[in-house]
Amino acid sequence: HNVGSLGNLAVETSRMENVEELRSYFDLNVFKVISLNTQFLKIFEEVEDRIIIVNITSLCAIKPMGGMAYYCSGKAAREMYFKVLADEKKHIKVLNYSPGPVETDMIGYVLEEAVNENLRDVFTSFKNQGTLLKPEITAKKCMKVLLAGKFSPGEHVDYFD
């Protein structure tokens, strides 16, 4: 599961009062993921012992980052859903994989839209120091983790682990 959007980076956490905007964010990033996963599991119920589910998560799911309340709370909710699924369905392999700072359009979006100065500084340093990961590099690491199979059910595994 790799759907994801950042949400509104122009609003401070203490000013998040647009309920429709919140609903829309959580609908895409949490509720639709749960719904899709539920339908998938219904269809493949007979082969559950061969199912591997990978949720693309973020360090933001477990560590708060000022200016990213939508993103952090959405990733945290989704990651917990998959941890509970792993606890209930012990024969399904579930991995919460955090790919690290990846060179995608997300970086530019944060630099343009974020009102939180510290957040912009963090992402600017990723970009300027060349620490952004190419998508294919972090995807290879995810595959290594999956093939090694040494992760606990629902575990959060970061690229840098």
Where are these regions (language model features)?
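Conserved NAD(P)H cofactor-binding loop of Rossmann-fold oxidoreductase domains
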Residues: 2-10
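Catalytic Tyr-X3-Lys loop
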Residues: 5, 15-35, 78
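Catalytic loop of short-chain dehydrogenase/reductase
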Residues: 5-6, 19, 45, 50-77, ...
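Short-chain dehydrogenase/reductase
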Residues: 26, 30, 37, 41, 67-76, 82, 131-132, 139
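Amphipathic alpha-helical dimer-interface segment in Rossmann-like NAD(P)H-dependent oxidoreductases
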Residues: 27-49, 87
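C-terminal helical subdomain
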Residues: 96-99, 114-161
